[in-house]
Regions:
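N-terminal (or domain-start) structured segment
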Residues: 34-124, 163, 171, 187-214, ...
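Stable alpha-helical elements in mature extracytoplasmic
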Residues: 53-57, 61, 65, 82, ...
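C-terminal lobe and pocket-closing loops
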Residues: 219-287, 319
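An extracytoplasmic/periplasmic, membrane-proximal ligand-sensing/linker region
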Residues: 39-41, 185, 224, 272-333
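Twin-arginine (Tat) signal peptide motif
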Residues: 2-19, 26, 30-31
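Short beta-strand segments
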Residues: 101-104, 168, 232, 296
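Hinge/capping helix and adjacent helix->loop/strand transition within the periplasmic-binding protein
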Residues: 92-98, 113-200, 248, 261-294
């Protein structure tokens, strides 16, 4: 018996045609977005308070970036929870290229190890856009501390277990991890005082409420003014700003490297053409002398690279710092 097709049910061919049209529509709309982007102001959320390294780098880059993109680029600070508050805000924003995150690389390489119940997955919910800078960490002490060299400082720490305190921008922050590296490799103990950002910690170091700090670069002007004493660099190489200051590796803490990477991220699903344009323009800005000078003044080195290379850097740090966090039983805020 011949069955007459029911016109109310689409055939397989019709379904495939509809799906193809839908896919083409998505591709066309994405391409159209990339062609017209940006046509309104762009917001960059910094997930640490104003005055810190992330904030200063963001402002150094976004100021000239405005001219390159032809739209205002507005910086907004949303600190707290180790950067997770600002990170979540960006991860849950529309993936249209108009909301970006400026963060240390710890957002994707450290926080997943610190916060097992994060409200978002930074690896899956954020896409790397561009690295901005590699910032060295500087071991600084209050001038009244009775030490003048890194060797004297380490001896003083060993002779006074638990009597010295150090400040950090928060539990699991890069300066905190640097201090935990120091405690592990030098076999010393000091009291950790976490803050909401590097700037308030620096103020208490200047005020004498803290004994030492791994500074991500915001206190170098105080070092030059004699208000803080710089003893060592917690990086693989000496700083060009202070070529006479040794690295911790040089004084016996072999392999010590706690550099902090900063960069820009976008919500996952942001059109690839938009990410490519942002990466290209940010890398151009990083090559200008004015931005180089501002990043160098922070104790950093401009780090232009592709999103793929930036992501690979985060993977390396994730393995390295993840092991430290587990060994030291470090907990997030």
């Amino acid at each position: 018996m011949h069955r007459v097709p029911n016109p109310s049910y689409p055939t397989t061919r019709h379904l495939l045609r509809s799906l193809a049209c839908a896919a083409a529509s998505v591709l066309l709309s994405t391409a159209a977005m990339a062609d017209t982007w940006p046509n309104k102001p762009i917001k960059v959320i910094v997930n640490f308070p104003a005055g810190g390294a992330a904030d200063q780098i963001a402002r150094a880059v976004t100021q000239p970036l405005q001219a390159a993109l032809g739209q205002p680029v507005v910086v907004e600070n949303r600190g707290g929870a180790g950067g997770n508050i600002g990170g979540e805000a960006v991860a849950k924003s529309p993936a249209d290229g108009y909301t970006l995150l400026m963060s240390s690389g710890g957002m994707v390489s450290v926080n997943p190890h610190l916060y097992p119940k994060m409200p978002f997955d930074p690896v899956k919910d954020l896409t790397p856009v561009a690295a901005a800078a590699r910032v060295l960490v500087f071991l600084e002490v209050r001038p009244s501390l009775p030490v003048n060299t890194i060797q004297e400082f380490l001896a003083h720490l060993k002779a006074n277990p638990g009597k010295l305190s150090f400040g950090t921008p928060g539990n699991g922050s890069s300066p905190h991890l640097a201090a935990e590296m120091l405690k592990t490799q030098a076999n010393v103990f000091a009291v950790h005082v976490p803050y909401r950002g590097a700037a308030p910690a620096m103020q208490d170091l200047l005020g004498g409420q803290l004994d030492f700090m791994f500074d991500p670069g915001i206190g170098l002007s105080h070092v030059k003014a004699g208000k803080l004493r710089l003893l060592a660099v917690g990086s693989a190489k000496r700083s060009p700003l202070f070529p006479d200051v040794p690295t911790l590796d040089e004084v016996g803490l072999k392999g010590f490297d706690a550099d902090t990477w900063f960069g820009f991220y976008a919500p996952a699903g942001t059109p690839p053409d938009v990410v490519t344009r942002l990466n290209r323009e940010i890398n151009k800005v990083l090559g200008t002398q004015a931005v180089k000078d501002r990043i160098t003044a922070l104790g950093g080195v401009p780090a232009p690279m592709s999103p793929t290379d930036f992501n690979a850097r985060a993977s390396i740090d994730s393995a390295r710092f993840g092991a430290l966090i587990k060994a030291r039983n470090i907990q997030g805020d």
